Every structure is written in structure tokens, then in C-alpha cells.
Amino acid sequence: MFKDFFNRSSKKKKYVTVSDSKQSDVPAGIMTKCPKCKKIMYTKELAENLNVCFNCDHHIALTAHNRIEAISDEGTFTEFDKGMTSANPLDFPSYEEKIQKDQQKTGLNEAVVTGTAQLDGMTFGVAVMDARFRMGSMGSVLGEKICRIIEHCTENRLPFILFSASGGARMQEGIISLMQMGKTSVSLKRHADAGLLYISYITNPTTGGVSASFASVGDINISEPKALIGFAGRRVIEQTINEKLPDDFQTAEFLLEHGQLDKVVHRKEMKATLSNILKMHQEVKTNA
């Protein structure tokens, strides 16, 4: 089995099966286990494949910066508001410690990275949520950063792309967290009133208050295959309505079938799809 770890031949499989009891034998960072099919792959080769599993095609989460790198021209990204970090407005116990722990783990100050970049020479504003930080939960700083990049796009007449990945509102900030739903939606309404494009790219998972606000109101709503998208949890809904839900309920494919998404896009087609949309938008704006 261990020969397969070091055999780089293209004719060999790029993964091996490792039992749960043997996971500790795999050096940290060198190998990555697919959360879906449990196959073990070289982290470097997986990254080159945009974190798409070679075996089952599962779309493993990308970091915010890796996502931006995958959709933009090299060296064109300029980050905004990098130093903004959450306070503890409600004096919630241990909240500061949890924030600091996630900052050390991820290298981020918040659960979203915002800025401007170019794709095939076209400038756009972008916000990418990173679920490694507080599960991408929506707090006051996340809402403020998103509003600021939207306002920048509106003022400079730029299209805006937002990649969502979130467990919902951040409970440690209470009503202040919930206020971000309305706050971001108002900024997006102003952007729309200016006749500007907003692309919502919903990734796995996007739930709770994020799915009920800015993630669902794009001019064009896109998602990745099998992404979990919903408000309340499956069990909560089943217990509330006392009915069994379809197996594919709250998946991107289910939402596409029911008209809540415009397209489900494989990650390898993500950059080309966004480029085509931006080009069409530019042509419409030029001819208007």
C-alpha cells in the first residue's frame, strides 16, 4: 500500500484507501482525505485539481484566497479592509478566544475576504467567505466588509461576485448579527438600482441567515454540484411538517430544478463561466 504513496506514474491511481485507525500515520499536510468517499490523495495534486476529488468528484472546500486565485488573473487581486476584526459587543463568554484561535488557524482576520481583481482583463469586485473561520458565520465585521465592497463596486460601476459558504448568523453577536441580513440587502438593492451586475456563487454549505439574505438575491445565482443550500436543518423541517423530505432536498440540483438557481457549475468550469457572464454584461453595458 505504501508504494502507492510515492508512485508518481500517471497510470496509477492518485488515491489509496486508509482506514480510520491509520489516519494518524499520514503526515499532516501531505495527504488529504476526501470527506465524501474517504479516499486519501496528495494535497498538492488535489490543489492542482481545484480541490475536486479524483475518485468521486466531490468538491472539497477551497480557502478564500485559493478561490480568488482560481478565478482571477495572476497578480490582479487587491484586498480591502484586511485589518478589520470582530469585537465582543455582547460580552459573550470565550468569544474573543475563539476568534483568536480561528485567526491563528486560518491566517484570516474574519470569515470573508473582499477586494477587486481582474478576469481576462475585466475588473470586478469580489467577496469570498471562508467556512474555516467560525463556520463562515455572519457577524458585524463580515456584514460591514461585504457592504463596503458592494458600495465600492456601485461607486465605480463594477460588477460584484460573492462566494458564500456559511452556517448562518453568528450567535455570539445576537441581534447585531441578524441586522447584517438587512444591511447587506440594502447595499445590494442600491447596486441593482444603479443597473449593475451581482453574481451570487453559492458553495457548500450555505445555510441560515446567509442563505436567506445576500446569497439568494443575485441577478445570476450559481452553485457547485451537490452543494448544501438551505435555511433550517433537514431534521428540523421534517419534524415540523411531519413529512419525509426528498433525498436530494436542499442540494444545488434540487434548487436548480425548482427555479431557485440559474446554473450548477463544475468547479473546473467556474472561471470560464464567470468570464463569459462578465463579457456578456460588458457588451450589454457598452451597447446600452
UniProtKB/Swiss-Prot annotation:
Superkingdom, natural source: Bacteria
Binding site for Zn(2+): C34, C37, C53, C56
Keyword terms: ATP-binding, Cytoplasm, Fatty acid biosynthesis, Fatty acid metabolism, Lipid biosynthesis, Lipid metabolism, Metal-binding, Nucleotide-binding, Transferase, Zinc, Zinc-finger
EC number: 2.1.3.15
Domain CoA carboxyltransferase N-terminal: 30-288
Entry-linked Gene3D superfamilies: 2-enoyl-CoA Hydratase, Chain A, domain 1
Pathway(s) where this gene product acts: Lipid metabolism; malonyl-CoA biosynthesis; malonyl-CoA from acetyl-CoA: step 1/1
Cofactor names: Zn(2+)
GO molecular-function term, one example from the UniProt record: zinc ion binding
Cofactor binding note from Swiss-Prot or TrEMBL: Binds 1 zinc ion per subunit.
Keyword Manganese: no
Catalytic activity: N(6)-carboxybiotinyl-L-lysyl-[protein] + acetyl-CoA = N(6)-biotinyl-L-lysyl-[protein] + malonyl-CoA
Main localization of the protein described in the UniProt heading: cytoplasm
Zinc finger (C4-type): 34-56
Subcellular locations according to the entry: Cytoplasm
GO process terms (BP): fatty acid biosynthetic process; malonyl-CoA biosynthetic process
GO cellular component, one term: acetyl-CoA carboxylase complex
Record family assignment: Belongs to the AccD/PCCB family.
NCBIfam families named among the record's database cross-references: accD
Self-association and partners: Acetyl-CoA carboxylase is a heterohexamer composed of biotin carboxyl carrier protein (AccB), biotin carboxylase (AccC) and two subunits each of ACCase subunit alpha (AccA) and ACCase subunit beta (AccD).
Protein name, UniProt field: Acetyl-coenzyme A carboxylase carboxyl transferase subunit beta
Organism for this UniProt entry: Staphylococcus saprophyticus subsp. saprophyticus (strain ATCC 15305 / DSM 20229 / NCIMB 8711 / NCTC 7292 / S-41)
Highest classification ranks of the organism: Bacteria, Bacillati, Bacillota, Bacilli, Bacillales
